[in-house]
Amino acid sequence: MSFVGGGGGQDVHKFVEALQADFKTLSLETKKKYPQIKEACEEAISKLCTAGSSQQNSVYYTVNQILYPLVQGCETKDLKIIKFCLGMMQRLITQQVVDQKGALYITNALWTLMENNIEEVKVLQTVTLLLTTNTVVHGDTLAKALVLCFRLHYTKNPTIVNTAGATIRQLVSLVFERVYLEKDSVPSLQQQQQQPSSSSNGPVEADGATAGQDVQTFASDAFLLFQDLVQLVNAEQPYWLVGMTEMTRTFGLELLEAVLTNFSAVFHESNDFRLLLKERVCALVIKLFSPNVKHRQLPAPNNGTAPVPAEKPYFPISMRLLRLVSILIQKYHTILVTECEIFLSLIIKFLDPDKPAWQRALAVEVIHKLVTRSSLIAFFCKSYDLKNHATNIVHDMIAAMGSFVRYSLINASVMLNGQQNGGVLAQPTNALSTLSGNNQCGFSFRGAYLPLVATYAPGVSKAVYLEMLDKLDAPNIPDSYGISVGHAILLDMTRSIGGVIQRTPELHPTHNTAVITEEEHQPLCLQLVNSSWSGLLSAFIPLVETSMDEATTENILKAMQNYAALCGMLEQLQPRDAFIMAMCRASFPPHYAMSIFANATQSDGDVRCHTRSGSQDLSSQFINSCTPDDFRPQIVAVGTPLPSASLPHSVMQAPVMLTNKNLQCMRAILFLAHNNGGILGTSWHMVLQTLQHLVWILGLKPSTGGSLQAMPKPAVEANVGIQTAVMADLPVLSQMLSQLFESSQYLDDVALHHLIDALCKLSHEAMELAYANREPSLFAVAKLLETGLVNMPRINVLWRPLTNHLLEVCQHRHIRMREWGVEAITYLVKSALQFKHKTPLKENMELQTMLLSPLSELSTVLHADVRQRQLDCVLQILNTAGEILSFGWPAIIEIIGAVNEHHGEPLIRTAFQCLQLVITDFLTVMPWRCLPLCISTAAKFGSQTQELNISLTAIGLMWNISDFFNQNQDKLMSTQLQDVAILPEFPGTVKMPQFDKLWMCLYAKLGELCVDLRPAVRKSAGQTLFSTISAHGSLLNPPTWQALVWQVLFPLLDNVRALSSSASNEKVDASGNILIHHSRNTAQKQWAETQVLTLSGVCRVFNTKRELLQMLGDFERAWSLILEFIQNAALSKNGEVSLAALKSLQEIMYHNTTTERTVGGVGGASLKDPQTTQEQDEEIWTIAWNIWLSIGMESTKMSTTKAQPQPSSNGGSNGSQDSQEDFYIPSQAFLTALIQIFPAIFHHIQVKFSPTDFDKFCTVLTNAVCIPVQTDAVPYIMSTVSDTLLTPLHDGILDCMELIQKEATKPDSHISQLIPAIFRQLLIFSKFACAPPTFQQNVEHKYAKSTSGHYANNASVEVVGMNYIPFGEKSISICVKLYQTTATEESVVQEQILHDIVKAVRTPLAMKYKCLSSSTWKLAISSLISVLHTGLKVARAKPQHFASLWDDLADTLDKFLFPASVCTIEDRGLEEIVLDETIDCHVIELLRDEVLPHAHEMPHQFIMQIVVLLNKGSIHSASDTNICYESDWKLREIFAKTCFETLLQFSLLEDHHATNNNRINANLLPAGAAGAVGKDFAGRLAVTALLHRFQEVLKRFNDDERQSGKCPLPRFRLSEISFVLKAIATLVVSMKKAPASKVNKPAWDQLIGLYPYLVDCTTTTSPEVSRSLREALLQYTDLLQAPRLCGATTNDNSIQSNGQE
């Protein structure tokens, strides 16, 4: 065993020294009473001295000798000595120097202490250390140590009992963990054990030699310990744990459980352990279970003689036994097969009704733990159910759970009825009536309510009563707890069975998990289903019927779906059909379901035994015991029953009432069929029959394509209705139905035929009923159609059976049957012809014949309505499939030519559909000369006013035409039309190609539609026009572009502007139309949308083709014109229009300049020389700048030309309204866009950017900032805020300022003279952080009322405050950075920019804590410090320009350091105040470093102000008006100290760079050194002021202390006087060291005058004040000297100087 230091001999030496010191202490303690211990200690010390001088590990050899005095000490019964000895033992153990013999000594000593009840907790700690530090303790010593802990566990002290219990659990686990070491289960632990041996000598080798013994011993110890635990639990004497006097069975069971839970590998790998487990533990468990098995809880007999009770089970024992059994089954089932069978059978018996409720609750919790693991279920089935002579554990368990669930429901009902019949008031929690309004989870049967008191995640068990280890008595079990857990068990059982069948791997497999081979899997799965299906079904049926909430029902139904699917996968038809039948029956009221499925139930003989009989049907029992009113809250739909041959007349007359649960079951059936349609087989008929009935009851009717939709009920059906909530679910149900039949495309051919046969069977039944003049169900026909549509890829598989049945339907005499039969056939034929088959239909004549055959056969039907639909279908086929059918094209021409002007809307619609088909599909085969006609025809349909949708679709057709032109350009260009008269002329363009004329014809027609009276048409036409130009404009020749711009686009803009200005402002009548949004409810607003669309579209075209237009001439005129259009729109009072105009302007301004240069320099070289291009460029950008400036000045000007209206005057109403119309607040988005345009313009005009331009620009910026924010713009600001919290507008403004600043600071910049103006503008912005701009307007105009734009009807525009703080702070930061780079610029110096900055930051610094944000003043002071670091140097160099700075600077510093605003800890917190004081100290440090060393270079008055400021801050009293709390005094101490030290440094001590010349007496200096004299004078003044302040504080303290009597002064007063006394001591020291010029005689006199006040302070009772006073008085020593008898030749100053020595 090695010493654990690992640090070499030095650590050993330290340890030995510590031991020696401890032994010396022990020797002193025992010297008088216990001399023998003293002698043993001295001997131990000598041993240690010898050991310390030898090798590192030699302490190990002497440990047994030095343990002797410690063991003796433990026998003294002296608590002090015992504690000391135990502490030394623990240190020896911790250092791992105790061997086996020493461990025995220590254990014996601890045993003695235990027997004498001394220091039990210390004893337990020592035992724990001894066993956990290493492995030297084993065998009998280990047993004795464990017995010691057990004995302490059964003392009377609860603290010791709990500590001992925890220790025993830890040590038992430790004993078994050691087994893992010898099994090499944890190689890293072995590696750690070997590491010390490789680096040590001596004893480690000896320990290594015993490693083999240890390995054998560890397993032996664990075996003996476990064996004795079993003995003790069995109330027998232990073999190994000798000395045990008592052991509770509960504690023993807990220890057994812990071992079996955590160390299963030990038992699985060792035969001895396995044998012990099988023979001893299992026998013990079975024996202890005896009371539980025999006990029966029976009601008392009537004769009053109670039977002799058997031994009553004890809850703590039973609960721990079941926990143990649970572990044995889960972890040891593979080695305890027979025993687990017994255990499982016992647990199942515990569910019997005659067992106590708590016993049943414990049993279901154990079962829940087991069923969540699919591997266990598989093992149970394989080991028991599959064996011939074994118990069918899985079957019995599930059957018992089913019985348990049913009993729980029936028992709750019986108990409730018994209470009510017996006159006892039933508990309100069990009465259903009291819970009718609650949506609680649970089950209800015959008025008894069983809430779900426990919920579990899927596959997770959570025991409640199995965890009650601290309970001595059986708890009261809620009535509903059993069914709550039982419900979860059934769900998890289903899930586990699914995991076995689908071979889902477990998340946490163990070595104990049973392996199921492929050969075993199939029989196992079949047996699982056979063992489980009847029990599960018998439990699920009552659970579904009695569940109260959707979530519970959903879980149960999902389990039934999954189980039915599993049965289908295994081809177990009987269980599959039984589960599906149960779900189908649950979808209807019981009496209705019995009538529907009467035949189905009789036909399946084997299934009937597992379905419900009348007496067993819990739902029918529930119905018989409840009134109809009980169902009212649950009923969500009431409908008429579907006529059926099986329904008796009485059922037909009564309405069918569906509950929410019925609909939930319907959804479950849909999910089952959708996801598992391939395994339904013959069950399809049952599923579809159920869905048909539900669809009928809910009123879903077939619509186009076979889908179902909810139709409004006739008003006469008063007793039929559907709740609103269900009405919302009907589309979802319809969609689910459609998806079910869409999924049929994934079925194989056999499954698909099963589905078709089931649908045809249902349809035949409906036809039979229709012959009796009953309303037929069209469900089957509709779904046959839907099934055919989704199976088009294999239409030949189902076409003949499908269409043959539909032809029969078409011949039916009932008109609705006929109507839907022909609808299905025609729809299928049209769809089949349009479908893209693998072999093209045009080539597959056989398929084409088969598809057209049913349509031809319809000619044999005599009914006229069927023939009409047939002809319509033929016409549609000719029109839609003309390329496939050779005779299709002539029919299209005939139909189009058949339309005349007098035809009504239906034929116009049909004709237009034909036109759509022609343009969409047949333009390629149309003659060239028809293309202009097609354009004009489409435009005619676009301008017709009968049907808006036709107009919009016609515009879409014009886009299709343009696409055709583009795709066939080569063909169209090569074809020359001889008859040119059909093409229009476009004047001004010479020899325009015919292809271009075709395009211009299209563009002109679209341009006319862009000014249609209908907004939707205008919008669609505009989008189409610009999309067409964008997509296909490149096909035009360059000269044609000029015609397009001047003859189409600019006239369009002019027309839109004119029509917009003349549009009405009255609300549009929306009667008969859809609702119109408020932003489009007037013609003016609708024209605004058009204006936005056209302007942005034209600008986009102009921008895209700018290079091309520049080459064609008239570009400047076009540029000016389009900018005028933009300016006109930007100044519109409609926010949408103005913002769109700015976006268009932005798009034009940010046009790619490199492209311009390329076109101008290369492409345009032949047209214009570079000089002309440059002049033109300058001219167009000057126009752009003027337009921008005009927009900016006008839009941000917040007063109107019609101001001062008189609203109260008689004739002033019109003027008031006009002024309100002219007044308009631009939005933040508008202003942001405006500002963001400037950088693009500035890039081109910066050379000519004058100070006047800058002033105008700043006017726009300032106005924009001051404009208030409207409430509707707040989301815009919030959604675009950056991390710096700047709004986009503020961000853009500062970006512009930085852009100009960056340009102005470049070398040889043209605009460098703007730097001072930039500073002033930034400082204007910075002031907004403290004083945000306010929007002031006349009362009549306040927050603008506008009758146009977004704010119609004179509604007030509400505005909100904007956060200007980030904007102002960012401005300050930019200003500081700019000043640091331009401080030495002549213009900056002359314009006194530093003074301006000081004045700007004075406001936030003076406000300080009154600032809106603390960041403002903090930024202001850091900015001031930064600029002063830079600016003071400039000020000293050029003092003539800074004369006005100093007073403002001193005033600013004073107001900041001593603010009027109060700050307390409650306001800001202690840390914040400390940080604030640190900032104040930084300011003082600035004065110390940058001002005071250069005092002779600064104005005398300024230096005096600084001295006064430092003096004011050097003592706390200077700011006593702002101090509200005692702790604040201390917070200013650092600041006061900094001020005081700075003052001393300035007034008394020499500068470190001073020369000898500076120390000459001030009177001897020439006049030129007045600055230095002023400095000395200021220093003396500072000393005098300090001394005067000291005297005031001392005097006031003495007076207050005398008046206070025995009451001590507040702490802050004592702190203040202590600081003053320390300051006096420091001042005296400094005055002694100061040169004579610094200190004059009056100062010494004043200092000496303080002495009486100091003497008065000696009466204080404060130790802190006394210490400080002592330091001050000691400094007066040098001032005390004998009076001189002879005259001195020196002057007073020299005397003082001598006195300083």
Curated annotation (Swiss-Prot):
Any one GO BP annotation for this protein: protein transport
SUPFAM superfamilies: ARM repeat (SSF48371)
Keyword Protein transport applies: yes
Keyword Manganese (UniProt): no
The name this protein goes by in its record: Protein MON2 homolog
Composition bias type Low complexity, residue spans: 187-200, 1204-1218
Domain of life of the source: Eukaryota
One Pfam family matching this protein: DCB
Main function: May be required for traffic between late Golgi and early endosomes.
Keywords tagged on the record: Protein transport, Transport
Protein family per UniProt: Belongs to the MON2 family.
Record region (Disordered): 187-209, 1199-1219
